[in-house]
Amino acid sequence: MPAGGRAGSLKDPDVAELFFKDDPEKLFSDLREIGHGSFGAVYFARDVRNSEVVAIKKMSYSGKQSNEKWQDIIKEVRFLQKLRHPNTIQYRGCYLREHTAWLVMEYCLGSASDLLEVHKKPLQEVEIAAVTHGALQGLAYLHSHNMIHRDVKAGNILLSEPGLVKLGDFGSASIMAPANSFVGTPYWMAPEVILAMDEGQYDGKVDVWSLGITCIELAERKPPLFNMNAMSALYHIAQNESPALQSGHWSEYFRNFVDSCLQKIPQDRPTSEVLLKHRFVLRERPPTVIMDLIQRTKDAVRELDNLQYRKMKKILFQEAPNGPGAEAPEEEELTPCSQEAEPYTHRAGTLTSLESSHSVPSMSISASSQSSSVNSLADASDNEEEEEEEEEEEEEEEEEGPESREMAMMQEGEHTVTSHSSIIHRLPGSDNLYDDPYQPEMTPGPLQPPAAPPTSTSSSARRRAYCRNRDHFATIRTASLVSRQIQEHEQDSALREQLSGYKRMRRQHQKQLLALESRLRGEREEHSGRLQRELEAQRAGFGTEAEKLARRHQAIGEKEARAAQAEERKFQQHILGQQKKELAALLEAQKRTYKLRKEQLKEELQENPSTPKREKAEWLLRQKEQLQQCQAEEEAGLLRRQRQYFELQCRQYKRKMLLARHSLDQDLLREDLNKKQTQKDLECALLLRQHEATRELELRQLQAVQRTRAELTRLQHQTELGNQLEYNKRREQELRQKHAAQVRQQPKSLKVRAGQLPMGLPATGALGPLSTGTPSEEQPCSSGQEAILDQRMLGEEEEAVPERRILGKEGTTLEPEEQRILGEEMGTFSSSPQKHRSLANEEDWDISEEMKEIRVPSLASQERNIIGQEEAAAWSLWEKEGGNLVDVEFKLGWVQGPVLTPVPEEEEEEEEEGGAPIGTHRDPGDGCPSPDIPPEPPPSHLRQYPTSQLPGLLSHGLLAGLSFAVGSSSGLLPLLLLLLLPLLAAQGGGGLQAALLALEVGLVGLGASYLFLCTALHLPPGLFLLLAQGTALLAVLSLSWRRGLMGVPLGLGAAWLLAWPSLALPLAAMAAGGKWVRQQGPQMRRGISRLWLRILLRLSPMVFRALQGCGAVGDRGLFALYPKTNKNGFRSRLPVPWPRQGNPRTTQHPLAQLTRVWAVCKGWNWRLARASHRLASCLPPWAVHILASWGLLKGERPSRIPRLLPRSQRRLGLSASRQLPPGTVAGRRSQTRRTLPPWR
């Protein structure tokens, strides 16, 4: 599908092949409007090529959102081209003409919602099963090809002439599954479609949910939550439980089928293939169920159209004499042909109908637009009542004849005839548009033509034309239904635009989120690519460095190997040279030895001359051979030893060289490893930096997504709130119009008698009728007060609640004088009782009857958060589904009258306490001074102090200076006391005499104490001086504190601290630290206690119980760490930080320390008790009994501290506690009590 290009452009060959090039106005004739919806209109037409009856859906793609409309048309055409199934609508083609797409499909008689509209009652279960079976077969075909319909409802389940059930209106369908678009009709939407933008995608199971809602619609004539605003219904569907059948007469198979379709979790919901095997759709039923239903509906449509035609004929015949140039017609009996033609006269367009101005206004939405028309009652008696109401409305509207005639006049030009049910475009020159070659002609009967405008043809000719072709336009839609859809389409354009705008806004939000996510994904990919390139560059550099290092190491190894070989050759040559020298020396020595031995042998032979010469020669030869043999052996031994030595030295040298090479290799490997470690560290640091950068980027992106989602949610909530307010205004206006119409329909006798009300009868007060009977009595409603009642019922309950609180008891009324006083206090003046008396005081109709059809919806929880808690509390009054709204108002005392302003709660509390509110005037009776009585003069005995402050400043300065001097020299303390006493006495009012008396008393006391202590008690003078200084210090401090002379103790302290600087600085530091500890102490103490408890909880259970027995763990600490363990019920008492009441210094009281010591002792006592309990468990029973009788053993009370049991035991205990004991039955309270949700 092309994303760009203007609407209607066929430059793309894939788009151009979807549409035919022919002119549709030349191919199709006899166009008649048979339905209307948000997309446009649906027309009945005939193909001039083969006289085939078709349905044409005209969709305009001009105006606003033209590109979106064009894309929707392309998507629907592509979807229809792929359908090849008997239970889906057959596609004939699509044509373009003047920015309008003509989508040609096969013609069907009507939809399942038309059956409900015609019969005014639900379908039978066997009929619902047949319709559901056909729809399921179509859905199974779609789902097998990964298609989703997404708009399954009774208005889109069509019935054909052969009795086949077909799925239609594929404008919301999706070719690909899964999908995530917000598409469909609100009341039939599945929860996952509503939450698709937030929670993900959905598949074909959404059609199964819509089919379940459609079953409820066919069984109850309307879907659940239909009396609620569409926006509120979306929230209820997503949040509340699944709906179910209300009536109890349906079979268990049907209930199980609906419950299976309406499973809230999509995974638990069966597919269409599985539902085709359900017992509800497979059980036996007559094969002609659909045909019988269609035939019965046709008969009902014929009867309704006959009735409507008789009403129209009566109006035309009554108005005919008043027309210009019209003659009074004479009524005559209708022939059978004309009677059969009556129901189809409106659809054929042969009469200028006034039906458009006489239709009953409906609150429902058109079946082919957004929902089925279900604004009717459920039985045949209600149908008769509605027909009577229609007759009364038509009689009332007879007075508006001229305006109605102007609306029904035929338009000139193309001879377009405007009727209640169709708009027929007749081309000039075509006399008969209804000839059917496949239908026999009927002989027309005589019929008196009604009065018609001059531009129209004769009525008898049109009737004859219709009689010849009455069967070629078979339908199960009444003329009033088609007309009502046309009127609702014109009137409810704002509602459709609102809902389409809401869907468009949701789609735009989804596109915006997808665009944002794609942009952020691109940023992440770019960031990841940049980091990857950086990492690869670093790794490439590391590889280059490693290669250089490897080449260097290789060169070093080769150089060392060559050097080692050269050294080895030198070493071998050196050893070989030495061995050669040794061998040459040996050979020289052997030669010398040989010569010497030869001479010795010769000398020995010469000494023995008797030996023959031959023997001498032989003996000498043997001796020489022996000598040579010994020399050869000695040479061979030397060579062997040299070879061994050579090999040994070579092995040793090679070993030494191998060790050196190994050491070198180790050094090189260590260098290589160090280099690789450095590179890995740098790479790890780079990866950490990249990870941190990636984390920051993802965090920023998540924040951007969350901000966008929050903004889009805020806009969505604002839009929904605005739509709800508009819905309230629209319903209020409709209710006012309905009330006005009902008041106009009242008999004139009642209106006349309303003005003749006796004077003795009571009238309506400001807050309700003064003569209040029982709440169930019918209270008349005047036309002048309709706005007040409607406004009270439709949106201003929050003002009635304070009114009821003011009145006290519900339903009480006020006297006229009280009403006048309240009106003056609140700023509103109630009118006189005569003004509240209306013409409808004796009307005999009940408001509760009209309120049964109009229910004001209750808001969802999200909308309550938007509107506020006060408005949400007021809206809760509308959630009474089965009650009567007006009866509730009468019971609560909410009747017509001016709305009182609520009294603030603060003023009520003040009045209850008996005190006057702030701002009220006081009189002399309350203790206030009167302006007539002069104020009393001040008493004369009081001394008038001089205005000069110089003496006081001098005395304070003198005392401060003396105090500073006393701090450095403690011997001046008595002098300071002696000066302080007369100064304070002089300031007290005694003057100089009092000062002298105080000085004398001080000196006498000092002298007397000295005489008594030093003379009588023989106290040392030094000790007396120290005692006098201490007494004087205490006296000075007490007197200065009593008189407020803060300079004295401050001077003493400053001088003392300056005299001892080594002590002053630590004291200042301790003071600062104490202040910080005092501020941060509770928080630190809580943190340390929590840390201590966490450390204890990580220990084994045995150790924890031991510490718990020692008093190391208390209830308070555990409850502070685990607040929910101290709950008493289903709610947790979470600790809330609150300032402690009382003196914070009480925590350091000695009693607190004693309490802690007592807790530790108690813990050790508990430990001893446990040990004694274990010891007692080992004793025999008689010994335990004796110890218990002596008082040494006592029973043990269970502790409130939770035990740390294993998880398996806790689960077993929880499951065992939830199970009831065998043989017990749960009480009524436990059965009826609703399970509370877990505390969050």
Curated annotation (Swiss-Prot):
Biased composition (Pro residues): 931-940
Extent of Acidic residues compositional bias: 381-401, 904-914
GO molecular function, one term: protein serine kinase activity
Record flagged with keyword Magnesium: yes
Enzyme Commission code: 2.7.11.1
Main location: membrane
Chain's role: Serine/threonine-protein kinase involved in different processes such as membrane blebbing and apoptotic bodies formation DNA damage response and MAPK14/p38 MAPK stress-activated MAPK cascade. Phosphorylates itself, MBP, activated MAPK8, MAP2K3, MAP2K6 and tubulins. Activates the MAPK14/p38 MAPK signaling pathway through the specific activation and phosphorylation of the upstream MAP2K3 and MAP2K6 kinases.
Record-given protein name: Serine/threonine-protein kinase TAO2
Source organism of the structure: Mus musculus
Organism ancestry: Eukaryota, Metazoa, Chordata, Craniata, Vertebrata
Record gene name: Taok2
